[in-house]
């Protein structure tokens, strides 16, 4: 029986970058790794309504730099920057080192797999019919320039006694093409009938060298490092 490899993991170092980038010796590695998980868990809980796409963590010179990609930057920053300063202090307390917190806006949340999966999960928890939720997300993504999208939901759909899997696809989603920029994410909807899993694949275009042929939807350009010469960095 054929199985699918993780679309993000197979492209690491080719067209995708790691979400944590830092170097540590054997003594400090486990502490830094644990701190990364704590910081991410804290931010995902604290910013559950801010439509967070991903969190990038870097550790330059005994400090930590956290970049949060969100579709609602104003909700995180708060009035006169009060909320972001509280977040920065909490992250510094968790990590125990000086902290720099950056907020980056996701300009096209309709092309972000994480935000799309969370959107479908939210609709299912509000008892929206799953087919309607899937079709709405697919149509919005294709309208805003996606080359292809696939959405899959599995579980006790509409309260059925037997769990099943249903999917909907439009356009191209070439999972075997490593130069294809495939954004993949997984989310869960906690309904009264149990947990429903949601998987989303978004094909944004092809990457030739360091040039992405379709806008990724982020406000800042993300450089793609195809070189394997930087051995002094530990990527997670």
UniProtKB/Swiss-Prot annotation:
Source domain of life: Bacteria
Protein name: Small ribosomal subunit protein uS3
Keywords tagged on the record: Ribonucleoprotein, Ribosomal protein, RNA-binding, rRNA-binding
GO molecular function: mRNA binding; rRNA binding; structural constituent of ribosome
SMART domains: KH (SM00322)
GO biological process: translation
Classification via Gene3D superfamilies: 3.30.300.20, Ribosomal protein S3, C-terminal domain
Domain annotation KH type-2: ranges: 39-107
Pfam families linked: KH_2, Ribosomal_S3_C
InterPro entries: KH_dom (IPR004087), KH_dom-like_a/b (IPR015946), KH_dom_type_2 (IPR004044), KH_sf_prok-type (IPR009019), Ribosomal_S3_C_sf (IPR036419), Ribosomal_uS3_bac-typ (IPR005704), Ribosomal_uS3_C (IPR001351), Ribosomal_uS3_CS (IPR018280)
């Amino acid at each position: 029986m054929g199985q699918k490899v993780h679309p993000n993991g197979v492209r690491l170092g080719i067209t995708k970058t790691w979400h944590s980038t830092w170097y540590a010796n054997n003594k400090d590695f486990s502490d830094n790794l644990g701190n990364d998980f704590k910081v991410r868990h804290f931010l995902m809980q604290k910013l559950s309504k801010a439509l967070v796409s991903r969190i990038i963590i870097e550790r330059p010179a005994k400090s930590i730099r956290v970049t949060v990609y969100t579709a609602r930057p104003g909700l995180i920053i708060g009035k006169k920057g009060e909320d972001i300063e509280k977040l920065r202090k909490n992250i510094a307390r968790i990590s125990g080192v000086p902290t720099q917190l950056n907020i980056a806006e996701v300009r096209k949340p309709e092309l972000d797999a994480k935000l799309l999966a969370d959107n479908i999960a939210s609709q299912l928890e509000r008892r929206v019919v799953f087919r309607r939720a899937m079709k709405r997300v697919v149509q919005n993504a294709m309208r805003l320039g996606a080359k292809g999208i696939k959405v899959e939901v599995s579980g006790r759909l509409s309260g059925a006694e037997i769990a099943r899997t249903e999917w909907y696809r439009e356009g191209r989603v070439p999972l075997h093409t490593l130069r294809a920029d495939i954004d993949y994410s997984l989310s869960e909807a906690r309904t009264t009938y149990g947990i429903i899993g949601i998987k989303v694949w978004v094909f944004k275009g092809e990457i030739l060298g360091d040039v992405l042929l379709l806008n990724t939807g982020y406000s800042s350009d993300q450089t793609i490092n195809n070189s394997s010469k930087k051995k002094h960095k530990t990527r997670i």
